[in-house]
Amino acid sequence: MVYPYRVLCYSKTNILSFSASYQLPEAAIHTFCEQCQKSEYVQVKCVLTSTSLEKMVPLNLLSSDRTMLIGMYIQSLEIRDCGAPAANDIGKIQKIDDYGQFHTLWKAGKNFTVLPGIDSFVIIHNNFG
């Protein structure tokens, strides 16, 4: 089976995304998830997100996972949307909805939702001290 998805792997301190605009073989997804689990990531979850909003699937984040990510600071790399924060802008995750979208308050005071697996960003600081 092939998936036209991006793979998102996250832990307490980082989000790692393996993206492909083409269809991704199931074996490649499993290999990436195995690499995540062997790396420094402690609490790794591998999920699939679609590359198009019409096919976007919920991330199925557990309540504890959402709590873990709320309050983390992210830096935008590339967000493809009108009115999106500029590259390298910094924002704080305020909440995560049922579709796994990160509702973020950006440094300029603007609220903007980030879509993991579609938008590119990195976590630069977390709320664990």
Tell what function each PLM region has.
Residues 2, 6-7, 30-33, 43, ...:
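Mature extracytoplasmic/luminal segments of secretory-pathway proteins
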Residues 1-18, 37:
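Short aromatic-glycine-(Arg/Gly/Cys) micro-motifs in beta-strand/loop hairpins
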Residues 17-37, 90-95:
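Short, flexible N-terminal segments of the mature chain
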